[in-house]
């Protein structure tokens, strides 16, 4: 036993060392794992903070946008912005302005919007070319796409009434009143604009809505030049339809809603360029009617000036 004592002591020491080494290894593993976990947590935390910051920034931008639109809308409603027309056009049907041939102005009009796939594209083209137009909107579309209706107005265009459902069939007085009055109301609530311009769907003059509009002092706006773009004609034909009847004081009918308007969008830049090459300027329907209203006075004024006796020249 005496001879085995040093061996046992050595064995005990080795076992202790092995045990201590194992303990240290386990401790290091735990420490390393803990540090790795902390690093992962820290990395994840940074990413989460970045995502949260981006979300908050986006939310602030959206809130700012809403506040700006709301502020503008409230101001518009408070001031009672309106698309008034001269009194002699109220309750009457207008298809063009009676202007002399040298007064080369024309009004582009768009029906059946706002429409998600096309109205914004039409607005982009008009904005690029610095043109103001008139949009005859459908009430239920204004309700479904209020941001597009607001953009029509904030881009400086005239917004007008094209009934709530775009129905063609005959309507009793109550239904006709609903179609027109509710559309005027949703336009006002959405954009702050009170409109006194109306266009009947399909140009139907006998289904009851025009009678209601006239009796309530709306100017019933028809057209003098029809693109027939609702038939999805080839672009050259569509353009030819417009220019076949185009003339000073004319009102051009096109569509930004109610279906596939890709041909209209494709044709619009060429239509604009062609009118400009012919010396035309673009105006809204209210501007066009104002010109007709004022033109006789201007003619009379200029005629009076020209008829004034000239003072004889001093010798």
Identify the meaning behind each predicted range.
Residues 70-171, 175, 179, 184-186, ...:
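Active-site beta->alpha N-cap acidic-glycine motif
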Residues 2-108, 115-122, 128, 270-271, ...:
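N-terminal pre-catalytic segment of deacetylase/amide-hydrolase enzymes
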Residues 16-19, 31, 77, 88, ...:
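Generic detector of intrinsically disordered, low-complexity, polar/charged segments
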Residues 116, 142-146, 206, 274, ...:
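Short, structured coil/loop segments at alpha-helix boundaries
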Residues 121, 147, 166-281, 285-302:
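Catalytic domains of cell-wall/extracellular-matrix polysaccharide-remodeling enzymes
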Residues 23, 114, 140, 162, ...:
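Gly/Ser/Thr-rich helix-start
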């Amino acid at each position: 036993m005496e001879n085995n004592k040093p061996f046992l002591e050595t064995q005990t020491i080795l076992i202790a060392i092995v045990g201590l080494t194992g303990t240290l290894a386990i401790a290091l593993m735990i420490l390393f794992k803990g540090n790795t976990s902390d690093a992962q947590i820290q990395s994840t935390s940074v990413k989460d903070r970045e995502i949260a910051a981006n979300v908050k920034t986006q939310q602030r931008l959206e809130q700012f946008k809403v506040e700006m639109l709301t502020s503008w809308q409230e101001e518009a409603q408070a001031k009672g912005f309106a698309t008034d027309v001269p009194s002699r056009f109220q309750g009457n049907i207008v298809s063009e302005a009676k202007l002399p041939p040298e007064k080369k102005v024309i009004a582009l009009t768009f029906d059946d919007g706002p429409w998600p796939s096309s109205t914004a594209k039409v607005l982009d083209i008009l904005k690029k070319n610095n043109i103001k137009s008139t949009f005859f909107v459908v009430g239920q579309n204004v309700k479904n796409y209020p941001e597009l209706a607001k953009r029509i107005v904030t881009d400086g265009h005239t917004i007008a009434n094209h009934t709530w459902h775009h129905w063609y069939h005959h309507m009793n007085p109550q239904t006709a009143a609903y179609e027109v009055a509710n559309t005027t109301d949703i336009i006002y609530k959405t954009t702050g604009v009170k409109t006194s311009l109306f266009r009947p769907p399909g140009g139907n003059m006998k289904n009851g809505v025009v009678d209601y509009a006239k009796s309530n002092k709306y100017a019933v706006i028809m057209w003098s030049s029809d693109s027939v773009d609702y038939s999805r004609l080839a672009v050259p034909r569509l353009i030819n339809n417009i220019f076949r009847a185009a003339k000073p004081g004319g009102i051009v009918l096109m569509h930004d809603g109610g279906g596939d308007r890709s041909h209209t969008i494709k044709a619009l830049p060429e239509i604009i360029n062609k009118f400009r090459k012919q010396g035309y300027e673009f105006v809204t329907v209210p501007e066009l009617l104002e010109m007709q209203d004022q033109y006789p006075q201007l003619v009379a004024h200029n005629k009076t000036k020209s008829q004034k006796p000239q003072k004889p020249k001093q010798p």
